[in-house]
C-alpha cells in the first residue's frame, strides 16, 4: 500500500537504523507537545528463596530461560517510544527530546524499544529476531497524507535470545505545511503474527 494524497511538494525521506543487539505518553492536549511523566512500572523482585545466596551462572541461565519464555508469551509492545535529540548508539542510550514541536524541515528522530518479539532458530545453535515496519502520516483531520507498507525491515542473529534490541527511526518531511500531524509506525514480528502500533503526534511550527 502506498499513499500520496497531498498536492503540494512533499518529499519524504525515510531511513531507519536498528541496532546493535546489545508510546509516547499521551499529553493533556494531544497536539500541545507537553508530556506527562510516564508512570514507572512497578517491578516486584523475585522471592529471595528462589535465588541462591550466591547464584551460579547456571542459576542465572535458568532465570534468563524463564524470562525468554515469558517474553515470547508477551504481546508485541514498546517499552519505550519517543522523539529523541540524536540517534542512540547503544540499547538504552536515548536522549529524550522532551517536545513534539518541530521546525519546518527538521527531521523526526524516534527511539523504539520493542518487547515480546520472537526468535527463529538458525542452524543448530543460533536465533534470529526480525521486525518489519509500516508507516502512515496523517493530518489532524485523520486523513492519510503518505504511507508505505514494509518500508523497513530489521533482523539480528545471535547465539542467545537477544532482548537488547532497539530501533532508531529517522523521518525527514520537506514541504510539509505548518500544522498538527500524527506519525504512525506499525511493527510486525517476523517470527510470529504479533503486531503493535506506535502513534507519535507532532506539530510543525509556522
Task: Kindly label every feature range from the protein language model.
Residues 1-27:
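Sec-dependent N-terminal signal peptides
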Amino acid at each position: 500500500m502506498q499513499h500520496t494524497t497531498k498536492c503540494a511538494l512533499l518529499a519524504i525521506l525515510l531511513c531507519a537504523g536498528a541496532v546493535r543487539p546489545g508510546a509516547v505518553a499521551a499529553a493533556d492536549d494531544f497536539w500541545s507537545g507537553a508530556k506527562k511523566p510516564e508512570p514507572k512500572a512497578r517491578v516486584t523482585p523475585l522471592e529471595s528463596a528462589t535465588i541462591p545466596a550466591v547464584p551460579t551462572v547456571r542459576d542465572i541461565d535458568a532465570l534468563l530461560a524463564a524470562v525468554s519464555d515469558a517474553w515470547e508469551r508477551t504481546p508485541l509492545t514498546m517499552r519505550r517510544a519517543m522523539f529523541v535529540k540524536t540517534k542512540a548508539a547503544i540499547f538504552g542510550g536515548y536522549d529524550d527530546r522532551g517536545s513534539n514541536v518541530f521546525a519546518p524541515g527538521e527531521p523526526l528522530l524516534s527511539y523504539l524499544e520493542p518487547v515480546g518479539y520472537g526468535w527463529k532458530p538458525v542452524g543448530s545453535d543460533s536465533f534470529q529476531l526480525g521486525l518489519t515496519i509500516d508507516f502512515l502520516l496523517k493530518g489532524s483531520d485523520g486523513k492519510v497524507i503518505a504511507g508505505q507498507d514494509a518500508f523497513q525491515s530489521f533482523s539480528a542473529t545471535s547465539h542467545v535470545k537477544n532482548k537488547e534490541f532497539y530501533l532508531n527511526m529517522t523521518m525527514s518531511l520537506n514541504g510539509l505545511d505548518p500544522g498538527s500531524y500524527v506519525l504512525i509506525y506499525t511493527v510486525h514480528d517476523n517470527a510470529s503474527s504479533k503486531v503493535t502500533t506506535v502513534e507519535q503526534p507532532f506539530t510543525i511550527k509556522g
